Amino acid sequence: PLSSPTIVGKRQPFPFLKNGEIYAVVVLETRNKKERIGIIPCSNNMLTRMVELPGGKGRYMLIEDLILHYIGKVFKGYKVKGKSLLKVVRNADIDADAAYDEDLDYREFMEDLMKQRKKLSPVRIDLSREMDETVVDALCRYLDVTPDRVFRSEAPLDVSFVFQLQDLLRRNTELFYEKRVPQKSPEFKDGQSILQQITEEDKLLSYPYDSIRPFLKMLTEAAEDDSVISIKMTLYRLAKQSKVIEALCEAAENGKEVVVLVELRARFDEENNIRWSR
């Protein structure tokens, strides 16, 4: 019930394939010996990517491999002649300068561009298995991609599952590299105000090699210091959860003037930056 299988035909056009998501594609033979292409999306927020197998802990299978294995049960009444996992990589280049109209709000303009990016033309097709040339040609025709842009890989098409695997195996410390902790900068003295220290002389932090704590402490001190009336900063790339933003918001709530220049075009972090700029 959580999957939406599609059989491409006259009544059902080729579906839109989202950028970077995994699909199971299958070649189906009808009773009349005609071939059809069937597609099942493997990405679903309701399904976990890694499925633990019975018979003992530590054995897992990716949901897309499970779907591909049993795909014949989904398309009952058809003969499976070939199958593979498929991933489409779409163009991510957006020319903001060429399309921008000075009469538009730039933030709203960038939001529209982010929506357009999701629908840009495919530039690459990744397959997990070899497929008949006629099928590959059909996929290329549907997606408007040349055959030299089709690649086959025995490795998983999306390795982001490693982060989930990391959480599952957290107790097995022997499987992990020793954690690298940012070093405590020798530039700063303990027990003294960061603002006072940078007033006396310039300081340099190189993140992630140096700990960012002195910088965050400086912002917190500035937010709480009555002598600070204004904070001005330039931010290029912001995370979904940002302690820098938390400190700046605290400063604004304490009556400080907070002016931040945010780069809305930080590649692949545009959505975070747009959200925080509000």
Model-derived features: positions:
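N-terminal localization/anchoring segments of enzymes in phospholipid and broader phosphate metabolism
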Residues: 1-278
